[in-house]
Amino acid sequence: MHVPVLLEELILALEINPKGFYVDLTLGRGGHSLAILEKISNGKLVVFDKDQDALDQTRPKLLAYKQNIEIIWSDFSRFDFYLENLGIQFVDGFIIDLGVSSPQIDDPERGFSYSKDGNLDMRMDKSQKLSAFIVLNEYPYEKLVEIFFKYGQIPYAREIARAIINSRPLKTTFELVNLVKKVIPALVLVKKNFIKNVFQAVRIEVNNELDSLQKLLEKLPKFLKQGSKVAIITFHSLEDRIVKKAFLDLIRKDKLEFFQKGLPKFSMKVFRPKANELKSNPRAKSAKLRLLLKNR
């Protein structure tokens, strides 16, 4: 069962207007969206997901709110195209949860989990060609090293890349796990789980996650009006750094007007999971919610 992370904090922070317009760019299993739909009577919610399985499994839960919802299958970096086609100029609140959902992790055939044996897949959108299998079996040594350094921050990037080249073809997640265990000393793995970082690096490459996030952040401001909010939940330092920089750039750009008018155009708040949430949902441990507010 998928438990939405930081749900209470997100709903309170959004201060939902019953007649407002909201966009959930990562529908997943619908936890955040359903909480919003319960609070908008005459409002509208547009939801996106690039994972067709997520849309198929979540759609039945949303039928009771069909007059308030629009469901779109797309990568979130193209959200502006769809909103403009719907005639939408401004949005009261954006919700983006950058985590991999529990059903995705728990399905061995999706290849996201290093604790379950399955195919080397890792595609969020199963219609795309690039998969973990292609990355690990066709990428040259230099490209693998770059991925492991850039997206996994792994000090053993060269050794892992060399071992992958020498062990091809790799077909399953456990083959990759066992390869990493042979390369990285056991005492090092006890202190830091670099297997997780290897899987993260490959997943980011397969799904073009950070580039898509950067494009999304560049497009968001034109849809914000006074009172609009953007809530983004991150799960690792790479994506959080990108979100933080984008938010701070908007805040700093307005410094002169701030001194003249006394109210910053943008401001930011940060929320972390409470102890009771961490106890019931350990996967929330690394989650961080950044909220951008447009004040004027």
From Swiss-Prot:
InterPro entries: RsmH (IPR002903), SAM-dep_MeTrfase_MraW_recog (IPR023397), SAM-dependent_MTases_sf (IPR029063). One of its GO terms (biological process) is rRNA base methylation. It is found in: Cytoplasm. Its EC number is 2.1.1.199. GO terms for cellular component: cytoplasm. Keywords: Cytoplasm, Methyltransferase, rRNA processing, S-adenosyl-L-methionine, Transferase. GO terms for molecular function: rRNA (cytosine-N4-)-methyltransferase activity. S-adenosyl-L-methionine binds at G30, G31, H32, D49, F76, D97, Q104. Its main location: cytoplasm. It comes from the Bacteria. The keyword S-adenosyl-L-methionine applies. It catalyses: cytidine(1402) in 16S rRNA + S-adenosyl-L-methionine = N(4)-methylcytidine(1402) in 16S rRNA + S-adenosyl-L-homocysteine + H(+). Gene3D superfamilies: Putative methyltransferase TM0872, insert domain, Vaccinia Virus protein VP39. Pfam families: Methyltransf_5. PANTHER family: 12S RRNA N4-METHYLCYTIDINE METHYLTRANSFERASE, S-ADENOSYL-METHYLTRANSFERASE MRAW. Specifically methylates the N4 position of cytidine in position 1402 (C1402) of 16S rRNA. Belongs to the methyltransferase superfamily. RsmH family. This is Ribosomal RNA small subunit methyltransferase H.
